[in-house]
Amino acid sequence: MIALDTNILVRAIVQESEPDAATQQQRAAAQRLLSSGQAVFLTVTVIQELEWVLRGVYRLHRDQVLEILEDLLAIEQIVVDRAAAIMDALEGYRQGLDFSDALHLAQARHCDRMASFDSKAYQLAKALSLEPTVAVPRA
C-alpha cells in the first residue's frame, strides 16, 4: 500500500486551464497511480488539506468539493484513515459546517462536549443536534 500526499490527489483531480509541461507530467503520473489498481492510503490530514486546497486555492464551490470527496472515498482501492469519522464530517459539511469543524466534531464523538470560541460553529452544531455538543468556555 502507498500513502498519498495531497498534491498527488490535487494533480489527479484538478484540470488546470493552461498547465505547463511539469504539471501535465505530474497529472499523468498521479492518474496512472490512482488507476493502477494498487491500494492507496489517505490520512485524515490529507483529506482535510484536500478540501482546503479545492475550496481555498481552486475556489471550488462546497457542492463540488463534497462531490469530489465522496467520489474519491468511493474508489475501492482507496483506504481512508478513520473513514467513519470522515463520512460523518462530510455529512456535517453537507449541512453547512466548515469541513474542519465537522471533522473535529466527528473525531471527538467519544467526548462529552467540545470547547470552542467559534460561536458560528457552536450555533450551527447545536441547531443540527450534532454530537458532541459544543460549549463556549466562560471566564
Describe each model-derived feature in a short phrase.
Residues 1, 105-139:
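Acidic, PIN/NYN-like endoribonuclease modules and their adjacent C-terminal/linker elements
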Residues 10, 34, 54-55, 93, ...:
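Generic helix-packing signal
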Residues 7-8, 45, 119-120:
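Alpha-helix/helix-capping structural signal
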Residues 1-42, 57-63, 129-139:
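Short, well-structured N-terminal submotif of metal-dependent ribonuclease cores
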Residues 28, 57, 62, 75-120:
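Active-site neighborhoods of divalent-metal-dependent phosphate/nucleic-acid chemistry enzymes
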Residues 67-73:
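Glycine/proline-rich, flexible active-site/cofactor-binding loop segments
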